[in-house]
Swiss-Prot record:
It comes from Mycobacterium sp. (strain JLS). Its EC number is 2.1.3.2. Heterododecamer (2C3:3R2) of six catalytic PyrB chains organized as two trimers (C3), and six regulatory PyrI chains organized as three dimers (R2). Pathway: Pyrimidine metabolism; UMP biosynthesis via de novo pathway; (S)-dihydroorotate from bicarbonate: step 2/3. GO terms for biological process: 'de novo' pyrimidine nucleobase biosynthetic process; 'de novo' UMP biosynthetic process; amino acid metabolic process. Carbamoyl phosphate binds at residues 56-57, 106, 139, 142, 267-268. This is Aspartate carbamoyltransferase catalytic subunit. It is an enzyme of class 2 (transferase).
Length: 316
């Protein structure tokens, strides 16, 4: 049966841990290699479909596939028949017919990845679909790389207190992180203005707060979210300056964190708004470590979906 990764809820604790373990193994296997190539996905075709702008996610999926010797093909809306009016369904069926083993999709519509998996389903030869971010819904591989970074920095995730700050309403990263961190045993606190919290958020497995200063001293990690102005139609807060004063991670606020705490950001960062440059570049920041881990996590995800966890992840 074709396997997909559409939401962080698809992963059990054991499955998520296995992916994180294999991500670490891939990292170690590539360490010191002059040529960063493993034969794991030789002969497989991986197609990325990005209908929204992306740097980190698109590049890391491409690098992940190439480091595993897959044939990686990039499809963008502007450079394909989508620009001529072709529907997502017809594009998906075309790529399935062309022999794709995996389709990695980023799309502005929530639920696009699920729809893609349903359209391309077949008795045989259906590609695995990986959600690389669908609207405000989810971004499961981002949650996995964040979890890997936390595990490396903190020594574990069970019982850790993770504070997620900012535009939760429009954040697929927040949704996937809440699901995965809860699965892995972390305590999650959401800090945001009331206007940037989803309806029904108090039914999530989280604590909700509007006071960032009160939450920082007990935090093991802080995940700062970008304000997604491109998804906003109205005034969700009075001004960027007021938002930064109330919810930005400034140098002064960083001093409230324990010395062992970790600062995460999925990027792109709005320096000076949700995070100061000095905090982003400080020793507590794991932003670049997240990027490195993104490649290894996506290697592990491709391996688990296309090869199977029962086979050896690393070979010469």
């Amino acid at each position: 049966m074709t396997r997909h990764l559409l939401t962080a809820a698809d992963l059990s604790r054991d499955e998520a841990t296995a992916i994180l373990d294999d991500a670490d193994r891939f990292s170690q296997a590539l360490l010191g290699r002059e040529v960063k190539k493993l034969p794991t996905l030789r002969g497989r075709t991986v197609i990325t479909m990005f209908y929204e702008n992306s740097t980190r996610t698109r590049v890391s999926f491409e690098v992940a596939g190439k480091w595993m010797s897959a044939d990686v093909i990039n499809v963008s809306a502007s450079g394909s028949s989508v620009a001529k009016g072709e529907s997502l369904r017809d594009t998906a069926l075309t790529l399935r017919a062309a022999g794709a083993d995996a389709l990695i999709i980023r799309h502005p519509a929530s639920g696009a990845a699920q729809q893609l998996a349903e359209w391309t389903a077949a008795e045989a030869g259906a590609p695995s679909v990986i959600n690389a971010g669908d609207g405000t819904h989810e971004h499961p591989t981002q949650a996995l790389l964040d979890a890997l970074t936390l595990r490396q920095r903190l020594g574990g995730i069970e019982g850790r207190r993770v504070v997620i700050v900012g535009d939760v309403l429009h954040s697929r990263v927040a949704r996937s992180n809440v699901l995965l961190l809860h699965t892995l045993g972390a305590e999650v606190v959401l800090v945001a203005p009331p206007t940037l919290l989803p309806v029904g958020v108090r039914q999530w497995p989280v604590t909700v707060s509007h006071d960032l200063d009160a939450e920082l001293p007990a935090a093991d990690a802080v995940l700062m979210l970008r304000v997604q102005a491109e998804r906003m139609n109205g005034g969700f807060f009075p001004s960027a300056r007021e938002y930064s004063v109330r919810y930005g991670l400034s140098d002064k606020r960083q001093a409230l964190l324990p010395d062992s705490a970790v600062v995460l950001h999925p990027g792109p960062m709005l320096r000076g708004m949700e995070i100061s440059s000095s905090v982003a570049d400080s020793s507590q920041s794991a932003v670049l470590q997240q990027v490195s881990n993104g490649v290894h996590v996506r290697m592990a995800v491709l391996f688990h979906l296309l090869v199977g966890a029962e086979q050896e992840a690393i070979s010469a």
